[in-house]
């Protein structure tokens, strides 16, 4: 018993250090339940104060499920994703436009099935990321696979009423991976029941 106490203390301090790290950017994702022009639903990505919509994620499903990320200011598609993720099959690829390099870069998302929950492995431009989520938690953390560097997290906000919109707080801790990667992952996890709606 006494041997496990120091281990628990170190583990608790480590978790608190991770949780206390300050984000460099924050967003609020708001799920829109209405359908428009062939899309199942949209998710608006707003600034942290919810005063300005920065991006829209538009999702459609058919034989191939699709998500497009639209820059709200320019109305340009800045990233797209396609594959199958709604049913048991999971196979997803995506492309993100890099304005500095003036080119599209591809990536993949794979599901890692667990007994009580699923995690995801993301590959993008030689970056390998994983998610960490417990079955009882509405918080998802993303980190580098190799060195466990903490990159981002998102969590669902508590709703007082069922008719109020589903909202997620997104916190970004690094510029090493485009924010679109996190937006895509959030959208897929939302489709697969993260908000349980």
Predicted regions and their residues:
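Intrinsically disordered, low-complexity proline/glycine-rich segments
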Residues: 14-197
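Classical eukaryotic N-terminal signal peptides for Sec-dependent ER targeting/secretion
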Residues: 1-9
């Amino acid at each position: 018993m006494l041997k496990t106490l120091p281990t628990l203390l170190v583990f608790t301090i480590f978790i608190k250090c991770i949780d206390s790290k300050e984000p460099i950017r924050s967003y609020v994702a708001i799920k829109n339940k209405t359908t428009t022009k062939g899309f199942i639903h949209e998710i608006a990505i707003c600034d942290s104060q919810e005063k300005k919509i920065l991006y829209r994620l538009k999702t459609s499903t058919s034989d191939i499920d699709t998500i497009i990320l639209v820059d709200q200011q320019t109305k340009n598609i800045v990233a797209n994703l396609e594959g199958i993720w709604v049913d048991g099959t999971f196979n997803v690829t995506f492309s993100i436009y890099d304005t500095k390099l003036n080119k599209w870069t591809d990536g993949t998302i794979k599901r890692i099935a667990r007994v009580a929950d699923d995690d995801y492995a993301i590959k993008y431009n030689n970056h390998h990321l994983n998610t960490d989520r417990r079955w009882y938690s509405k918080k998802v953390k993303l980190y580098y696979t190799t060195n466990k560097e903490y990159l981002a997290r998102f969590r669902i906000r508590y709703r007082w009423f069922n008719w109020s919109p589903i909202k997620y707080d997104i916190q970004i801790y690094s510029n090493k991976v485009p924010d679109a990667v996190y937006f895509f992952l959030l959208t897929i996890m939302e489709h697969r029941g993260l908000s349980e709606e």
